[in-house]
Each structure stands twice: as structure tokens, then as C-alpha cells.
């Protein structure tokens, strides 16, 4: 993904080229460095939050040749069972920030996670690291991220929460929030909602609740 993320801007660059073949070839050589990425095998993916999504991301990353280190002090027994033994458990969140070449956050937005990716934690990251946020916009202090990008202490930021701060930043890729924008995803969401309601009514169980144990049977 990191190496292919520039396909669209690279295609736009190609459309701006004018002149004969020789001139175009020179322009390509002069401009292609701006689209250089890096390959995933051997890199370290840091995962903050090992819930249902975080576990799937961590396990999938192993198949791409990444080393994976994760942190979640409240990981459930169910999610721990599904987490590959090859995923290294960090002793602290700060350890993940320090070690990651690519850092991805998968936590719900609650008071404790608002601004979780802060100036102080960003300062721990490698200058070559890339931050991914496909959870909630407010989990990341966007001002701090933009400052880190401008200062060269963070390589890139990828999110699906376009804002005026990151939309046109040269080191940011902001996508539409499309994670559930398929017919299959919408159907699965409806099924999960129905299953959750039935489970709560039948035995008081609520899976994937972000406010558990406050969700109690009246």
C-alpha cells in the first residue's frame, strides 16, 4: 500500500506532461522521485487497539511480511484467542510509537482516546514513519500531525477523514470515509445489529460494546 499510494497523483502528473518523447522522458526522470515509497516486508507495523478490527489488521499484516507489534491493555479473551502468536505484545503504547515504521490506530472514540495521538507521542516516532488513522478523526491531534509533517519528524499521514488541514497537504493522503460503503458491508452491519440486540435480550451479552459494562439489562 505504501508503495502504491501514489498511483493517482502519479497519473495526474503524467497527464501534465507535454512535448515530444525525449522531453517527456526527461520530465519523468526529473519528477518521479516525488512518488517513491517503500516496500512492506521486514517493516514493523504498530497496532494500537486489538479489538475485532485491530486483530484482523495485525494478522493480515503478518501475511504481507510485516513484523507486527500491538498494544491493548483491555484486550478481551475472545480477541486474544484470534490474535496470531506471531504478533508481539508491547509493554506500553509508547513502545509501539517508538518502534513502528507504520502505525495504525483502531480504538473507539471515548474521552480516554480523544487526542491519543498527541504531540508528545508523535515525538517518539521515527522520522521515516507513516501514521494511518481509519478509526475516528478526533483520536488524532491533527494540528500536531501537521506540525510533525511540516517539521520533517513524520513521513506521512493517511486517513479517511478529509479536512482543510490535511486535504491538500503534500504529505497527507485523505480518502473519503468509505469503509462501510458497500452493499455487503451494509448488510453485515444490519446482521450484526440484529445479532447484538438478540444476544442482549436473550442473555444480557453485548459484543463489541464501546461503553461496556454500562450497557446493562433494565
Q: How should each PLM-predicted stretch be described?
A:
Residues 43, 50-51:
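Glycine-rich Rossmann-fold phosphate-binding loop(s) that bind the pyrophosphate
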Residues 169, 178-218:
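NAD(P)-dependent dehydrogenase/reductase Rossmann-like domain
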Residues 69, 73-166, 181:
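Rossmann-like adenosine-cofactor binding region
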Residues 34-41, 62, 123-124, 166:
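Short, flexible hinge/linker loops that cap or flank conserved catalytic cores
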